[in-house]
Amino acid sequence: VLYDIHGNKADVQEDIAAATLAAVRCPIASQPLQKVVRKGDKVAVIVSDVTRLVRTAEFLPVIISEINAAGVPDEDITIIVATGTHRAHTHDEDIAVCGKDIVKRIKIHQHDSRNNEELTDLGVTSFGTPILIDSYVAEADKVIITGAVSLHPMAGFGGGRKAVMPGVSGHATIMHNHAIALAPKVGDGCNPLCETGLLEGNPLHEDMVEV
């Protein structure tokens, strides 16, 4: 054994719903969710697809309830499954991710990165990446991102902006962004700035943020 690595201890959240409610009512550096959305808004809620281990079904009902409490009815809410380049969910997978009650109540849209008719062109990043975003997201008045923060071998960390890029981005956007993980010179392997746990100076991460 070369190293014995110990992480910082953290309290285990036994009640995910209660923790979620506390977070959306008293968030860090933001207004409470009920003050962010308002009656008349079209709200898009992005959720991770079935390939990601996220306990969405335990916290999503709380988020939907808070949106409702702000005056936004179910019919003005769309859940976007952030498939990236993955396939669409089956109905059973939607239930596994979102929960049976939410699937019955709320419209669920499966992102398709290759369907250009469902993408909105928002320009180009400073890295030259075309910004093609799912139109349900681009045209929403408010967008709520959910997901898990985790280590990522190219982007530094997963979560946050990755729900949008690659989650609900076009295929061309994803391919151009991910190519940044390769060294600028052909044959030199991977870009040394794109590595696990590194955000500052990581061009792949910075491009994602621009998207």
Question: Which residue ranges define each predicted feature?
Answer:
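N-terminal amphipathic/basic leader segments beginning at the initiator methionine
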Residues: 1-24
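An acidic, phosphate/nucleotide-engaging active-site surface
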Residues: 89-158
